[in-house]
């Protein structure tokens, strides 16, 4: 197996924590968004089950966002000069765990819950908008690719590390192979290979680049979340007599 020859430095640790902060903020956006939706559902008695389910997701996501927000590297000075996987592997494994839950949440709010809400209330304004669904799915793919890059840019793929396997990446590759898709010609970001970094400056620059890309996607999602939340809030305001 090929490994990145770059070792841990103070600059790398700082850049990694910046990336972690971006992921933490991303999860926090979901928490705020879901809380707004829960507030609306509280006024509709027929959506009791949907509300309880979202509350469960919110509690779990809030905990995970807090864990990422407080992520640190104990014994930082002792880590300097050691291999990158000592700090990247645990982080990658935790992010994968978080995004497996987020995958289930995305499916729930964009499909089953959406259908049930419309069926029970006959109101399409009490659900996640079509535009937001597109953004959620697109952002999720980009954030997953960021995790893949974080893990695979320091060592080539290894089937002996199931805790670092990304289901969406594996499934997309499997389907592409079955369909005889040329990976090198595909525009699907999930099929694009990740190159192992060779020098510290390159790794730090790429960490910053990924942080910038993810912040941009997060901003797009935040705007749509805000539009949905405003629409929901307007529907729950009492009518003035």
Swiss-Prot record:
Biological process, per Gene Ontology: mRNA transport
Q: What are the record's GO terms for cellular component?
A: cytoplasm; nucleus
Record-linked Pfam families: She2p (PF11435)
By its UniProt entry, which Gene3D superfamilies does this protein fall under?
Answer: She2 domain
Highest taxon of the source?
Eukaryota
KW Magnesium (keyword) present: no
Molecular-function annotations in GO? RNA binding
Check the record and name the SUPFAM superfamilies matching this protein.
RNA-binding protein She2p
- Keywords for this entry? Cytoplasm, mRNA transport, Nucleus, RNA-binding, Transport
Q: Which family does it belong to?
A: Belongs to the SHE2 family.
Q: What is this protein called?
A: SWI5-dependent HO expression protein 2
Q: What is the lineage of its organism?
A: Eukaryota, Fungi, Dikarya, Ascomycota, Saccharomycotina
């Amino acid at each position: 197996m090929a490994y990145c020859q770059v070792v841990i430095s103070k600059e790398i640790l700082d850049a990694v924590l910046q990336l972690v902060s971006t992921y933490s903020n991303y999860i926090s956006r979901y928490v705020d968004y879901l809380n707004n939706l829960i507030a609306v559902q509280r006024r509709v008695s027929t959506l009791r089950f949907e509300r309880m389910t979202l509350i469960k997701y919110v509690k779990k996501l809030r905990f995970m966002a807090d864990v990422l927000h407080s992520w640190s590297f104990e014994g930082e000075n002792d880590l300097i000069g050691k291999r990158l996987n000592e700090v990247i592997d645990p982080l990658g494994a935790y992010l994968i765990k978080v995004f497996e839950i987020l995958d289930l949440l995305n499916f729930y709010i964009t499909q089953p819950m959406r259908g049930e809400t419309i069926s029970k209330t006959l109101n399409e304004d009490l659900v996640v908008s079509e535009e937001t669904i597109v953004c959620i799915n697109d952002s999720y793919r980009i954030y997953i690719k960021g995790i893949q890059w974080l893990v695979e840019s320091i060592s080539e793929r290894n089937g002996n590390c199931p805790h670092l396997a990304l289901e969406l990446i594996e499934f997309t590759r499997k389907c592409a192979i079955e369909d005889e898709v040329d990976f090198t010609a595909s525009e699907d970001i999930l099929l694009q290979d990740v190159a192992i970094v060779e020098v510290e400056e390159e790794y730090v620059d790429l960490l910053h680049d990924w942080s910038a890309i993810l912040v941009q996607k997060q901003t797009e999602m935040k705007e749509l979340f805000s539009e949905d939340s405003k629409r929901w809030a307007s529907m729950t305001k009492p009518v003035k007599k």
